[in-house]
Amino acid sequence: TALQLNKYTVSSERLPRAFDGCKIAHISDLHNTEIGKNNETLLNMLREAKPDIIAITGDLIDSRKTDVAAALHFAGEAVKIAPCYYVTGNHEARTSEYDALKTGLIKLGVTVLENEKTEVERAGEKITLIGVKDPSFSSDYLFHDEEAIMESQLKALVDKDDGFTLLLSHRPELFDVYVTCNADLVLSGHAHGGQFRL
């Protein structure tokens, strides 16, 4: 499995000065893949990047070959590098082992966000981090469209007074919904290589 590090610089007048230079490592869709034995290649890349935050946006496990222990090993090492924030993907919704994964992540110190928000503080200033559960967890998933489910989830979380807001959600195709919630930055996965391919 090839591993590539992409670096992006995000600028916003809404970002508190204390977050200038803040590094976020974004990991998504590992699907229980090991990049190097016990994910050491990936973990070494994370260590070298020295992130301030690690965002994991779903599909840490694969519903066809779920290995909770491998996922927890990766998360346990990642949380030693930087605070980790995790949201679910569609593969977590498809397995009966999600509760074991969630419990293990929490025990390791990973912040699991299921339609919740939290604050990240740095030098006395704060940003809001919102994490939404994948729509496929909803009991209405078969009867309602994903946009309606996501809109409902976000409506309860969004507050225009929250300041700079970072949204973690597995699904990039719901970006039109995210725009309406005033998120300043959205991190998502699911697309395995991008929304646009040439």
Question: What is the predicted role of each segment?
Answer:
Residues 14-17, 32, 93-187, 191-192:
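Conserved catalytic scaffold of divalent metal-dependent phosphoesterases
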Residues 196-198:
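Alpha-helical membrane-targeting segments
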Residues 18-113:
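Membrane-embedded segments
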Residues 10-12, 42-44, 68-73, 142-144, ...:
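Short, functional N-terminal and low-complexity linear motifs
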Residues 1-18:
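N-terminal membrane-anchoring alpha-helices
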Residues 5-7, 27, 129:
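Hydrophobic residues on conserved beta-strands that form the core of alpha/beta folds
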